Amino acid sequence: MNILNKLGIGSSRQTNMDPSPIAQVIDDEAPAPGNQFTQFGAGCFWSVELAYQRVPGVTQTEVGYSQGITHDPSYKDVCSGTTNHAEIVRVQYDPKECSYQSLLDLFWSKHDPTTLNRQGNDVGTQYRSGIYFYNPEQEKLARESLERHQQQVDRKVVTEILPAKKFYRAEEHHQQYLSKGGRFGLKQSTEKGCNDPIRCYG
């Protein structure tokens, strides 16, 4: 994924790299009526977003940056490792159609939460594992879920569980990247319930 950084894509934003209190506030954007938000960080946000797009009851996904110190970062800023942002997928879901627990189960299945600041060949703090909650019930379920998952693996789970902070939507070409075809125009299905393997490519 860092190839975009090398090509200079996503670098049009002019970011003030000084720490900003704006970046530290709780995400107060409102989901659609009857829906809830949650945020997940599990490595490259392209493949994580596609996984959640396929979940019945998920009504919207967006990729972006959160948990950092600067206001309105660009992809290039985040890749520099100096802003402390994580690559995030913000998931909007209808709790009548999709349980939060099912979203957590998918989270654990789609990445290795025992590798610190790394998923596969993607290395950096922006690729860290994280669950970012919007209410006490989400926090409770997330922590219980982590405890259960820890019992299933030999190495220490390094996933952080924190309140969801301000969400900075990523540049448009990152949104639904794999379903739009990615770099090579190879579109991948977003059909609800689809189990096709997800191929993440720049």
Curated annotation (Swiss-Prot):
This is Peptide methionine sulfoxide reductase A1. One of its GO terms (cellular component) is cytosol. It catalyses: L-methionyl-[protein] + [thioredoxin]-disulfide + H2O = L-methionyl-(S)-S-oxide-[protein] + [thioredoxin]-dithiol; [thioredoxin]-disulfide + L-methionine + H2O = L-methionine (S)-S-oxide + [thioredoxin]-dithiol. It comes from the Eukaryota. Its EC number is 1.8.4.11. Catalyzes the reduction of methionine sulfoxide (MetSO) to methionine in proteins. Plays a protective role against oxidative stress by restoring activity to proteins that have been inactivated by methionine oxidation. MSRA family specifically reduces the MetSO S-enantiomer. The modification Phosphoserine is found at S189. The gene is MSRA1. It is found in: Cytoplasm, Cytosol. It is an enzyme of class 1 (oxidoreductase). SUPFAM superfamilies: Peptide methionine sulfoxide reductase (SSF55068). One of its GO terms (molecular function) is peptide-methionine (S)-S-oxide reductase activity. The lineage of its organism: Eukaryota, Viridiplantae, Streptophyta, Embryophyta, Tracheophyta. Gene3D superfamilies: Peptide methionine sulphoxide reductase MsrA (3.30.1060.10). Belongs to the MsrA Met sulfoxide reductase family. Keywords: Cytoplasm, Oxidoreductase, Phosphoprotein. Residues 1-20 are annotated as: Disordered. The keyword Iron does not apply. HAMAP family: MsrA. The keyword Cytoplasm applies. Its main location: cytoplasm.
